[in-house]
Amino acid sequence: MSFVFRGSRGDLESGFSGGFLPERRAMRVHGARPVNSNSLAFLVTVLLLFMILNSHQMPPNFLLWLVLGVFLMATTLRMYATCQQLQAHAQAQAAAASGLFSHTELRLHVPPSIALATRGRLQGLRLQLALLDREFDDLDYETLRALDSDNVSTTSMSEEEINALPVHKYKVLDPENGCSLAKQASTSSSAEKMLDSANESKKGTEDELTCSVCLEQVTVGEIVRTLPCLHQFHAGCIDPWLRQQGTCPVCKFRAHSGWQEQDEIDDDASDMV
């Protein structure tokens, strides 16, 4: 079995993007001719001529020379065809080695035993090339996540755990003193400490806060929920996310364990004191 490719170097570099896949005429797969088919045909012809001309009306020497002439002609034609095939194969190999695929013909003779497997690989490659231009949807994303062995499944958060996270009304920081104009009390003492440290670290930064879930700017007076990683979001945006994922959308930090770990650290510090 032999594969014939007719194309240019630009087709290979562009990944056959110029309509190569729909046109199957560019890739031709056909069976190779038997090696001894022409020799058998000429041999049968010689035998027929010998049987027809083998009569007493013609001298034996003439028949012998006629048979030898036909045999030599058949051998010459067969050698010429073989030389043409070898020359074409050598030219294709030279063009492949030099990287010049400008309308050249490359013939690869494949044994019939692996022809079926090679055809299956070509069909798989054609399918992969066809999927390159397709857009991925949510189903493809979930499939890739399921195939990822390093992706550890995260548990969702309950309503009690979500309500335990601190919330407050968003207030713009005063640029002169760097402190907030007004601020609601947090739900726990550890949350207040972490929020105070977060507000102190925000001095000199931009006052605008953007919710990474809805990608909208947080305005003054909106309810903002703070995660243990100190990332802030709209309460209405982050709550549905936490019910499904239980992690921060920005840094993937587990939100259901952050405040508990911080409380344990504070308790250990108070016990040591």
From Swiss-Prot:
E.C. number: 2.3.2.27
Transferase found in the keyword field: yes
Ranges facing Lumenal side: 55-56
InterPro entries, per the entry: Znf_RING (IPR001841), Znf_RING/FYVE/PHD (IPR013083)
Any GO MF annotation of the entry: ubiquitin-protein transferase activity
Subunit structure: Interacts with ATP1/SDIRIP1.
UniProt name for this protein: E3 ubiquitin-protein ligase SDIR1
Gene: SDIR1
